[in-house]
Structure formats: structure tokens, C-alpha cells
Amino acid sequence: MTAGPDEEDPAERKMRFLFAVRSRGVTDARVLAAMERIDRGAFVRGIFADRAYEDMPLPIACGQTISQPSVVGLMSQALAINPRDKVLEIGTGSGYQAAILSQLARRVYTVDRHRRLVREATELFHRLGLTNITALAADGSFGLPEQAPFDRILVTAAAEDPPGPLLAQLKIGGIMVVPVGQTDAVQNLIKVTRLEQGYDYEELRPVRFVPLIEGIGTD
């Protein structure tokens, strides 16, 4: 007798999840190991909980989304994080992306304009024992200058251009990954590397993200 979706063996479910991520281009061993350790199901609540292991974005609170796992993996892979790196994430959301980054970097700072999301993510980080993440309610479009410079910056919301304040907070040799383009159209995921003089830009793939909005939310 075949088990139903609710009775799926956790090991088989994880194997299927990782296979889907690998089949979409996530090949870095450290990233795959991080995605194996961090259970996406812990970050998806309510009526969408049974879809946590599908490769698709899902709604969360405050009108935001948790990105599809393959995109989380590809963005993490593009950052080429070293174990001693200090990373800034713009857009905490559910906290899933920051949790993945925490397995790759020495220290992760993540900011979001929605206080509720920061509060819920912080509680979840504590529950999961992820002690190298600091989540803050802040206007992410201005970065986190008091902790700059950063080895890596990940922006999980779309900007019309790579934000100048974030570029300025990258170390020389640092990498930023950011979706660029209009929010009502397909955007391009851009990898920016800071050089001794100027920046190098590389287009990675088309994506769809919520917009990067200035200011602090009221929720």
C-alpha cells in the first residue's frame, strides 16, 4: 500500500527536495549541505505548510513570500561565501534564506522593514539554535552602515538598479547578488563584484521578486 503525502517518509521527502534543487542548477556541495540541514518546513506555516518541500515560492505574512528553494540555493551559490565571511541580507522575510546563509558564513546580519517578520524570524532562529544571525527592523535600501563593510550582500527584493548605499558597504573583492528590474516584469539576477576601482556586473538568470521599498513598515 502506497503512503499518502502526509505519510511520506522524511528521508525520502528530503531526498526528493534536494534532487529538485540540484536539477535546477544548485551544485555547490556546501550549499546543498546547508539546504539538507535547514528544514524549510520550519519556515512555512498555516495552510501552505504541506507545500513546504515543493520548489515554489509561497505566501507569508505582511504580503511577502518565501522564495522557491532552487532560487535560494542559486543565490547562495552565486555569493561564493567563505566560512569567515560576514554577510548582510536585505529582506529577512520568513528567515529561511538567512538560515541557509548562517551555515555558510561566520556571521549573518539580516534586515527587514516589517517588524513582525523580524520578530518571528528571531524567535525561530533561537528555537533552531542559529546563534550567528542578527535580525533587525531597518530600511534595507540603506543597508547596515554601522556593521559595514561586508564580504557578501544578498538582496531578496527587486531594485531598479543596484542600490548605491549597498554597493558602498561591500569590501573590495566583495560580492553582492541582487534582483534588478521593474517589479511588474521579469527581473534579472545580477552578481556585482567590487573591484579596486569600480564594479563588475554579471547577469545570472531571470527572476521574480517583490519590490525593495524604502522606509519601515507599520506592522
UniProtKB/Swiss-Prot annotation:
Give GO terms for biological process: methylation; protein modification process; protein repair
Q: Which PROSITE patterns match?
A: PCMT (PS01279)
Question: Where can this protein be found?
Answer: Cytoplasm
Where does this protein chiefly localize?
cytoplasm
Question: Which keywords appear in this protein's UniProt record, sorted alphabetically?
Answer: Cytoplasm, Methyltransferase, S-adenosyl-L-methionine, Transferase
Xref: Pfam families: PCMT
Which residues are the active-site ones?
S67
Identify the CDD domains for this entry: AdoMet_MTases
Q: Where are the transmembrane segments?
A: none
Q: What class of enzyme is it?
A: transferase
Q: Name one GO cellular component term.
A: cytoplasm
Question: Which InterPro entries would you find in this protein's record?
Answer: PCMT, SAM-dependent_MTases_sf
Which reaction(s) does the protein catalyse, per the Swiss-Prot or TrEMBL entry? [protein]-L-isoaspartate + S-adenosyl-L-methionine = [protein]-L-isoaspartate alpha-methyl ester + S-adenosyl-L-homocysteine
What GO molecular function terms would the record report? protein-L-isoaspartate (D-aspartate) O-methyltransferase activity
EC number(s) from the headed UniProt entry:
2.1.1.77
Which domain of life does the protein's organism represent? Answer: Bacteria
What's its job? Catalyzes the methyl esterification of L-isoaspartyl residues in peptides and proteins that result from spontaneous decomposition of normal L-aspartyl and L-asparaginyl residues. It plays a role in the repair and/or degradation of damaged proteins.
Protein family (similarity comment): Belongs to the methyltransferase superfamily. L-isoaspartyl/D-aspartyl protein methyltransferase family.
The protein depicted here goes by the name Protein-L-isoaspartate O-methyltransferase
Organism this protein belongs to? Cereibacter sphaeroides (strain ATCC 17025 / ATH 2.4.3)
